[in-house]
Amino acid sequence: MSHFKSAEEAAAAGKYVRTVRSFVKREGRLTKGQAAAIERLWPTVGLTLENGRLDLAMVFGREAPVTLEIGFGMGHSLVEMAANAPERDFIGIEVHEPGVGACLMAAEEAGVENFRVFHEDAVEVLKQCIPDNSLNCVQIFFPDPWHKKRHHKRRIVQPEFVKLLIQKIETGGVIHLATDWENYAEHMLEVLNDEPRLTNLSSSGDYVPRPENRPKTKFERRGEGKGHGVWDLQFKTNKSATLLG
């Protein structure tokens, strides 16, 4: 067991400590269409850790607000939101390769060009590729709830991860989370409320109604038909707030 309190502390001492991952990377099996879309479109829209720290204006060929979606699944929300907001640019991160392929197929069919994608670990992308204060919005919709208590440490929404997000988001930018697991929603709310540099945009101090710009998924509609709830959270960054501790 390591005596270092964090990966950063270990790195400073020249040591490597394996960090807890919030995902299991599953390559899965690509359909022919997904494989063809990746081969055809990746040179244009694909990004990797090897790109290093990005100049987002150069990546997109313009200055525009940038939304980052972490864990875009099959890409439905990413593509629809990019299509509906051509004045914005979008970056998606997904570890499941068939999801990347499906996203590229959908984007090509919709004629969407204001997006880029990573097939990487979100934490590494944030640390290595995303400049500080460069994002206008970070959205994470229906992340893995890791519902067993012993797996809660694998949930992506944790205090250290939120600190990393704030570092990458401009002042006044937004973190938007959504989940259909009430226990995870409560966990998210607690983590975000405990961060002094975030302000809850909910008038009731907890959750917000689903924003019109967040598309409903088929899974979400099915769940609603069965009486399942969905919880959206939106918090705004306020970096002038004093950090406690």
Curated annotation (Swiss-Prot):
Catalytic activity: guanosine(46) in tRNA + S-adenosyl-L-methionine = N(7)-methylguanosine(46) in tRNA + S-adenosyl-L-homocysteine
Annotated S-adenosyl-L-methionine binding sites: E69, E94, D121, D144
Organism this protein belongs to: Idiomarina loihiensis (strain ATCC BAA-735 / DSM 15497 / L2-TR)
Protein name according to UniProt: tRNA (guanine-N(7)-)-methyltransferase
Cellular component terms per the entry's GO annotation: tRNA methyltransferase complex
Taxonomy, superkingdom: Bacteria
Pfam families membership: Methyltransf_4 (PF02390)
Molecular function per GO: tRNA (guanine(46)-N7)-methyltransferase activity
Transferase as UniProt keyword: yes
Enzyme class at the top of the EC tree: transferase
InterPro entries: SAM-dependent_MTases_sf, tRNA_(Gua-N-7)_MeTrfase_Trmb, tRNA_methyltr_TrmB_bact
Region Disordered: start-end pairs: 200-225
Basic and acidic residues: bias regions: 209-225
E.C. no: 2.1.1.33
Alphabetic keyword roster: Methyltransferase, S-adenosyl-L-methionine, Transferase, tRNA processing
CDD domains in UniProt: AdoMet_MTases
Transmembrane stretches, start-end: none
Gene: trmB
